[in-house]
Amino acid sequence: MGKEVDNKFTWVIKNFSSQQSRKNYSDEFFVDGCKWRLLAFPKGNGVEKLSLYLAVAGSEFLPDGWRRHAYFHFSVVNQLSDELSQARETKNWFDASTSDWGFTSMLSLKKLHDKDGGFLVNGELKIVVDVSVLEVIGKLDVPVESEETTTKALSELEENDVPEESEETTKALSKVDENDGAESNDSLKEASSVKESMDVNGFRVLPSQVETVSCIFERHPDIASEFGPKNQHLRSAYMNVLLSLIKTMCQSTQELSKDDLSDADAALAYLTDAGLNLNWLEEKLEEVSEKKENEEAGETRVHEIEEELKELKLKCSNLEAQLEKEKADVSVARAPFSFDDIV
């Protein structure tokens, strides 16, 4: 079931918890003359998280050399509080080799299936996608009135205040089971080129990332001394994975799950295998993992103490009731007989 309004498409998946298929496709919808559909993995695409992708519908029927550049924003709607909705965004070039793109780790299944979490109401999951087509190479799926919808420049996107690609949304190079950033659902893909970028120690990064990356090289100048890849696209993609990993580790232990830490450990191994010197980050990740263990152990102790306190309060309440009864009995026993009682 789906509903299209302007550039937004709403997909309501009924009886989500009872879905048996590995993956589900939404109805097809049109945005700027291009035909799309959503792809979801209800039980996760190799991870314990909802996996969600935007796909070009009918890509097998498009002519050779077709390409589409699109920005899109996903939102898994929390039906109890919109502020708790899970949102992710990215942009990517779609072509014959990359007909879908999105997020393997959109939302943890534990949080999704929480009966009081607000994501599943009456068995329904609601997903909203907002798509903006930036450029089209090859024919459109439907005729449009204006040539402007055939080719949209990136500058037009910026004029409409569409968000720039962020660190978290460009983690495109990681393996599917090691990454929670934007990626194709079925293979390792090269990150889309970024038109506006700056060089920091041989890495092309976004202007918003310059300060952070510069700080990393200042504190760890040998971080890339043995780094293998020379291609700028690959180097940028690895840097985005590193920045996203650091951002993940900066979250509170309450926000981090064991799955998150497992993914972080896998991502770290992936980066070190490429030649990045990250011994310092490995130590910090161990500290974060230890803090998570301490938090969980502390939560367990708190729960145990709360239960013990509850039992003690109940026992105290019972003792107080028994005390009042005993006092009443003593009061009765102390009362003297009257003349009438005796005579």
Swiss-Prot record:
Biased composition (Basic and acidic residues): 168-178
Keywords attached to this entry: Coiled coil
Domain (MATH): residue spans on this chain: 6-131
Location of region: Disordered: 156-193
Superkingdom in the source lineage: Eukaryota
Entry keyword annotation includes Manganese: no
Membrane-spanning parts: none
Entry keyword Coiled coil: yes
Acidic residues: bias regions: 156-167
Coiled coil regions, renumbered to chain: 271-335
InterPro entries per the UniProt record, alphabetical: MATH-CC_domain_protein (IPR050804), MATH/TRAF_dom (IPR002083), PLipase-like (IPR007942), TRAF-like (IPR008974)
Protein name per the record: MATH domain and coiled-coil domain-containing protein At3g58270
Organism: Arabidopsis thaliana
